[in-house]
């Protein structure tokens, strides 16, 4: 633990030096330079102008999108040599070098070529830094919004089934519990992240795959296997990283879908609302989304027990950004979700009555599970770059609070708070020993506070009186406590530190890294080591090795 604290202090010292240098340069770029770039983006095959294409000045927070006519303009750019990157889903990413100068306006046009297998898409799960998918040292599969739209998937769980090597199982027809399997391994061996942060707790994972609406997802990155040291010891079978949508241009949409389940009287209704706003100078923006879903219970064989539970789900959230300078950016995200799910028998009766053979009107014991969730999730991230494009620093904090009221043979209440905070630093070497390289290091602290207790009173009182009908006072209280399940209050703190160096060029990539996690309920720290490589340009065999001890 002392080593982690020392590492944290060293990182803070290094950060302060970098920030001082960055802010010194920022003062220079706040003065208008009148250095502008304009142009258009067209489809290489058809010559058609393409709207909504993303244009960014790499190494800065400056960017724009093409308008409805396929044109763009970047104004008051910092002086120097930069790389402009143009990208869009379904097209190969194109980059061009450009030198900007004070009072200089220049035209720069782009042609985009269709990318049928999305090898040029940018991913972050391979090494916690933006990397083209074909250059990533580990194989990253990507689920784009197009997949969700074409398959009419309204939730994460529905979309994941279209990813090879990934299987979503519905393991309980009573409550609808689902888990994701990668390479055949159980769900507990898969690390689920939201914007690269491990705030998807064990409690959230029980029903969470169905609780994340598709309209908040920009893409889902899936890594099969544990070929990265930058994620925790839970990433054994693989990692699923849910990247949320950010505002790109001013737009809005409204949609409603209705699906019938196997020609029965059960329907799944889903209503979505999306609004995106970006200021005229592209310095701030917000993406607001909402979903309302209602699915009636489905009884496939008419035996009185549901195969799919009844669902009522409402989600609302936003994702916003503010560019504090040309080299720094603040992101904030929040969403709130309410869900009611009820499965089993006696759908129109209260759970405890539907389960009692003397009260439910059937003379047979029922089987019932009912859950009500209230979930709040938020995150804050601050990114900082330097003008020479060698330093990339980020601070982040994320949290998720879950309140769940449940019934399964008895009423209960569960609350869970998961919080994550940390810092990450990336340094780009022009040459490290034999090749350009990116060195990544960081620290992370994760806190989880789980409280689970029974709220049933009458049921345990009746059980106590059945044992001793004459019991009163203290004796009755002792008997009630005897039958009441013990409450659980568990607090877990995990300190983590990781480092990784990746040598890469257009044809070769070598990576070595390690991570240490100190869990408060374990005596020894968990060490994770990994190595991977990728070679060749058109055929890219990859090798990965990792160990956990």
Where are these regions (language model features)?
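Outer-membrane beta-barrel translocator/receptor signature
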Residues: 201-203, 216-218, 229-241, 245-301, ...
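Flexible loop and strand-edge segments within Gram-negative outer membrane beta-barrel domains
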Residues: 295-315, 321-393, 399-418
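Short acidic/polar hinge/loop motifs at secondary-structure boundaries
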Residues: 73-76, 179-181, 197-224, 245
């Amino acid at each position: 633990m002392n080593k982690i604290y020392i590492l944290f202090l060293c990182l803070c010292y290094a950060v302060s030096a970098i920030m001082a240098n960055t802010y010194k340069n920022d003062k220079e770029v706040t003065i208008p330079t009148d250095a502008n770039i304009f142009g258009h983006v067209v489809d290489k095959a058809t010559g058609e102008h393409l709207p909504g294409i993303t244009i960014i000045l790499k190494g800065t927070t400056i960017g724009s999108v093409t308008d409805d006519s396929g044109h763009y303009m970047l104004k008051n750019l910092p002086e120097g040599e930069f790389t402009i990157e143009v990208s869009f889903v379904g097209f190969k990413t194109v980059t061009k070098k450009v030198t900007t100068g004070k009072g200089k306006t220049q035209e720069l046009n782009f042609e985009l070529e269709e990318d049928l297998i999305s090898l040029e898409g940018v991913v972050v799960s391979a090494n916690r830094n933006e990397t083209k998918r074909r250059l990533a040292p580990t194989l990253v599969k990507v689920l784009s919004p197009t997949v969700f739209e074409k398959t009419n998937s309204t939730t994460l769980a529905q979309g994941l089934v279209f990813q090879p090597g990934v299987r979503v199982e519905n393991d309980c027809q009573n409550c609808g519990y689902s888990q994701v399997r990668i390479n055949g391994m159980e769900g507990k061996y898969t690390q689920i992240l939201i914007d690269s942060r491990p705030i998807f707790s064990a409690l959230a994972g029980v029903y969470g795959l169905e609780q994340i609406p598709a309209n908040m997802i920009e893409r889902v990155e899936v890594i099969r296997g544990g070929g990265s040291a930058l994620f925790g010891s839970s990433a054994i079978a693989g990692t699923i990283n849910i990247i949320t949508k950010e505002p790109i241009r001013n737009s809005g949409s409204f949609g409603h879908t209705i699906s019938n389940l196997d020609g029965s009287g059960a329907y799944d209704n889903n209503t979505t609302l999306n609004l995106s706003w970006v200021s005229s100078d592209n310095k701030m923006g917000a993406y607001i989304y909402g979903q309302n879903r209602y699915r009636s219970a489905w009884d496939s064989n008419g035996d009185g027990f549901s195969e799919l539970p009844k669902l009522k789900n409402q989600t609302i959230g936003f994702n916003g950004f503010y560019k504090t300078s040309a080299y720094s950016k603040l992101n904030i995200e929040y969403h709130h979700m309410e869900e009611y799910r009820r499965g089993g028998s006696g759908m129109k009766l209260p759970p405890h009555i539907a389960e009692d053979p003397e009260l439910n009107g059937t003379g047979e014991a029922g089987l019932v599970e009912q859950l009500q969730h209230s979930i709040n999730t938020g995150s804050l991230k601050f990114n900082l770059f330097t003008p020479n494009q060698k330093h990339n620093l980020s601070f982040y904090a994320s949290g998720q609070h879950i309140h769940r009221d449940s019934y399964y043979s008895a009423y209960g209440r569960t609350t869970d708070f998961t919080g994550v905070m940390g810092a990450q630093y990336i340094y780009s070497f022009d040459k490290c020993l034999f090749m350009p390289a990116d060195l990544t290091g960081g620290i992370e602290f994760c806190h989880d506070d789980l409280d689970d207790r029974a709220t049933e009173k009458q049921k345990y009182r009746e059980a106590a009186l059945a044992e001793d009908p004459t019991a009163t006072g203290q004796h009755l209280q002792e008997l009630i406590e005897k039958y009441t399940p013990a409450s659980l209050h568990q607090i877990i703190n995990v300190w983590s530190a990781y480092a990784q160096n990746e040598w890469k060029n257009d044809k070769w990539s070598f990576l070595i890294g390690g991570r240490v996690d100190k869990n408060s309920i374990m005596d020894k720290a968990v060490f994770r080591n990994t190595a991977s490589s990728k070679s060749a340009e058109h055929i890219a065999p990859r090798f990965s090795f990792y160990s956990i001890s």
